């Protein structure tokens, strides 16, 4: 028998039937037990099929000395049973590459099937035989999983097992392939036709991806292969607490699942699917003999009780202490005292029937007894212990599956070129900017998916969005309800959209916390697939400090391709505060909707506030001066509605209005042209922070005088004494009062209406839809 200890590309592989590919890393003495178990698998196979040629391929990927030592001591178990053993020391430090390396070696030997093994688990005796028999019976390329999984750990044997997991085939009437969206229903050690591995390989992690075994299974499903289950097979799966590549990968939250065709709209929507409620009803039919969806909680007295903590690991078997690692007899006594006494005989009879009906037969009990000779799995009557465990079926339906299936099933959704994330629809300028962007994208034949990542209210923008060709708007409440999908799960779903939707080119984020977190968490992966555009308009600060969008922008700025804003003022502010060179910041003036010109300029001693009621818009700064305004006979008319999403807004100023004689709340308004501009002398906009508010642009275009706080990009469009006044101390009520009184005291010295109109036309000429679309096209590539 020939077995090289290093890889050699010149080796000519001999023809084999089955390859056993075993990946080793830092298993140490655990592989000593695993090799014995695999040897039993080969013996059982060869007793039934003596002419089969079996090859074992072993990779030692960056092994530690302890693993090398035990490989040398353990390889004889394989040498005695296989026809060929080949082992290779490699330095991938990546499970996917180790697996692919061995797969290529096996394919060189023209094998028909490849069994993937890990180096620290145990297997039922006829595991390999049952896999091969099912493959022959299928008569087509196969992917086969074991039927049962028992969990154990590296120190405590089976005491970590709380149940037996029963796997179902992906085409089983009680299982769905779409359930693989939210959970991996299977395990890593699969029996696969070599023809499948010729087409599909493991995706290398490369420090970017994790869950390679989950990934290859969904790739196989996407390619049309069912996942089968071999009856009467069992794996005792060892969950190592430390030192494994899986543990290392799972602890790195920056790693994600690699792209897969499984998540593309066309493939996923083409899979057989039932919704969560239907799956719940269907799975309930499996409660005899197996348990699904935590049904056993209703029958807790019928099953074994398991307790884990940092100081004890106690498993009670009837009245007897089956496994204990408690140092203190006190703890043992207390644990036993608190448990309900169980009738062991009744439990055995009850559960033995369940096990038998579920396919866990006498052969498997015999296998467990043999495996107990390799590794003591429990200190007392292992088979009796197994007999008391409930069997859970790994269906794991989830509302997340429904949401993604519904999303992928939308008409023409696979044509999406632009993903746009907003918080929710409001009547503010940010959403007008969003609608303008969607309109520009729509007119250039882009396909846009707009997702509101926060719950919102009814809004007039909704109808306009839904009428734009190629634009699909999905609201959080309707499509992504918080009761079914939290923000983190929504981020992961959006990441899968970005990774796998075939025509997606741009991710655009406008004030969406989910969107910002998505970029911050997964920027490396996102940038491999799309360009990242952020639209932001002001440096937000309130009484609690910087607002979230302002804070996180400084984190994600390095990852984005472009920051679009509406004025040079904000660009200069960001460059000054952060030291950014500004090359990624692109000011683009937003177009102004047509408005009615002011016709009546006779002084009426009426001023107007129009906008949202929020912590940002400081209406209280004007109301503070109501007595002084009343002395001059100045009336304040207030238009707008409460921003319900603003948690800092307490509504105090609106309640205050009811107590003031010279202030009147006139209700909400739907568009600037609903405002009675001929009945007022000016628009006042007290504000804590601002960009270039749409209400100001529309007021200037209508030739209405404007008083506003000096912040953001407002100095670009308002010039003192010509078309308005800027309040330098924008958080000072007296400063706003002085500006109002100055207007009335100097009204005869201000520009005439015609002069003001010409001035406004000059400074607003960039706020044109054609110019806007030209500049947006430069950002979005047309």
Residue spans of the language-model regions?
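Non-catalytic membrane-proximal stalk/linker segments that position and tether the catalytic domains
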Residues: 1-14, 256, 261, 265, ...
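Acidic donor-binding loop at a coil-to-helix junction in glycosyltransferase catalytic cores
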Residues: 208-216
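Aromatic "clamp/platform" in nucleotide-sugar-dependent glycosyltransferases that forms part
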Residues: 688
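Conserved donor NDP-sugar-binding/catalytic core segment of glycosyltransferases
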Residues: 129-160
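Nucleotide-activated donor-binding/catalytic signature segment of Leloir-type glycosyltransferases, i.e.
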Residues: 74-84, 472-475, 650-669
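Short hydrophobic beta-strand element within catalytic cores of glycosyltransferases
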Residues: 705-708, 718
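Glycosyltransferase donor-sugar binding loop
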Residues: 60-62, 451-457, 635-651, 665
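A conserved mid-protein helix/loop that constitutes part of the nucleotide-sugar donor-binding site
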Residues: 29, 431-436, 614-628
């Amino acid at each position: 028998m020939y077995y090289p200890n290093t890889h050699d590309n010149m080796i000519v592989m001999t023809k084999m039937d089955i390859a056993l590919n075993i990946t080793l890393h830092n298993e140490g003495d655990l592989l000593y037990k695993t090799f014995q178990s695999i040897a039993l698998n080969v013996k059982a196979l060869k007793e039934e099929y003596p002419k089969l040629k079996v090859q074992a391929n072993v990779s030692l990927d960056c092994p530690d000395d302890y693993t090398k030592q035990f490989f040398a001591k353990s390889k004889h178990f394989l040498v005695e049973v296989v026809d060929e053993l080949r082992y290779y020391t490699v330095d991938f430090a990546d499970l996917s590459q180790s697996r692919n390396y061995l797969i290529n070696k096996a394919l060189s030997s023209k094998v028909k099937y490849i069994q993937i093994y890990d180096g620290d688990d145990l297997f039922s005796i006829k595991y390999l035989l049952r896999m091969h028999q099912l493959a022959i019976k299928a008569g087509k390329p196969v992917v086969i999983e074991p039927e049962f999984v028992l969990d154990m750990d590296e120190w405590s044997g089976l005491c970590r097992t709380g149940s037996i997991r029963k796997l179902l085939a992906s085409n089983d009437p009680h299982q769905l392939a779409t359930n693989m969206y939210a959970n991996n229903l299977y395990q890593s050690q699969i029996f696969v036709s070599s023809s499948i591995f010729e087409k599909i390989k493991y995706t290398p992690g490369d420090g970017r991806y994790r869950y390679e075994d989950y990934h290859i299974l969904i790739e196989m499903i996407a390619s049309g292969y069912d996942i089968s289950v071999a009856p009467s097979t069992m794996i005792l799966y060892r969950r190592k607490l430390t030192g494994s590549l899986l543990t290392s990968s799972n602890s790195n939250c920056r790693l994600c699942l690699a792209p897969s065709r499984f998540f593309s709209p066309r493939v996923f929507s083409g899979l057989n699917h039932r919704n969560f409620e239907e799956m719940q009803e269907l799975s309930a039919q499996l409660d005899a003999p197996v348990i699904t969806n935590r049904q056993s909680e209703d029958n807790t007295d019928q099953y074994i009780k398991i307790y884990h903590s940092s100081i004890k690991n106690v498993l009670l078997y009837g009245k007897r202490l089956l496994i204990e690692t408690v140092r203190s007899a006190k703890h043992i006594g207390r644990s036993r005292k608190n448990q309900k006494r169980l009738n062991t005989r009744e439990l055995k009879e009850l559960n033995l029937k369940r096990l038998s009906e579920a396919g866990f037969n006498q052969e498997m009990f015999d296998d467990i007894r043999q495996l107990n000779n390799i590794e003591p799995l429990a200190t007392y009557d292992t088979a009796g212990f197994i007999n008391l465990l409930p069997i859970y079926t790994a269906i794991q339906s989830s509302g997340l599956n429904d949401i993604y299936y519904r999303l992928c099933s939308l008409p023409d959704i696979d044509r999406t070129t632009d993903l746009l994330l907003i918080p929710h629809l409001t009547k503010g300028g940010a959403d007008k900017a969003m609608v303008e962007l969607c309109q520009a994208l729509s007119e250039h034949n882009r396909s846009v998916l707009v997702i509101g990542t926060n719950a919102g209210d009814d809004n007039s923008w909704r109808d306009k969005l839904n009428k734009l060709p190629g634009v699909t708007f999905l609201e959080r409440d309707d499509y992504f309800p918080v009761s079914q999908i939290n923000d983190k799960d929504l981020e992961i779903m959006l990441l899968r959209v970005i990774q796998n939707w075939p025509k997606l080119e741009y991710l655009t984020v406008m004030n969406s916390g989910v969107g910002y977190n998505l970029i911050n968490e997964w920027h490396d992966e996102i940038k491999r697939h799309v360009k990242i555009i952020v639209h932001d308009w002001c440096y937000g600060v309130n009484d609690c400090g910087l607002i979230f969008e302002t804070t996180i922008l400084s984190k994600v700025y390095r990852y984005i391709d472009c920051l679009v804003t509406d004025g040079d003022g904000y660009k200069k502010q960001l460059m000054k505060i952060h030291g950014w060179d500004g090359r990624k910041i692109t000011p683009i003036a937003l177009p102004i909707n047509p408005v009615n010109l002011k016709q009546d300029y006779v002084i009426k001693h009426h001023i107007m506030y129009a906008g949202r009621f929020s912590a940002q818009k400081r209406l209280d700064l004007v109301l503070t001066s109501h007595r002084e305004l009343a002395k001059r006979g100045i009336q304040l008319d207030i238009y707008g509605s409460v921003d319900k999403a603003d948690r800092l807004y307490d509504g105090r100023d609106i309640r205050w209005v009811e107590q003031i004689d010279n202030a009147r709340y006139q209700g909400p308004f739907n568009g600037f042209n609903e405002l009675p501009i001929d009945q007022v002398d000016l628009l006042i906009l007290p504000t804590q922070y601002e960009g270039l508010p749409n209400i100001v642009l529309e007021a200037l275009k209508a030739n209405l005088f404007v008083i506003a706080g000096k912040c953001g990009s407002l100095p670009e469009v308002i010039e003192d004494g010509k078309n308005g006044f800027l309040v330098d101390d924008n958080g000072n009520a007296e400063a706003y009062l002085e500006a109002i009184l100055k207007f009335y005291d100097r009204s005869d010295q201000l520009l005439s209406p015609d002069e003001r109109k010409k001035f406004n036309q000059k400074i607003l000429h960039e706020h044109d839809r054609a110019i806007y679309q030209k500049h947006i096209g430069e950002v979005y590539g047309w």
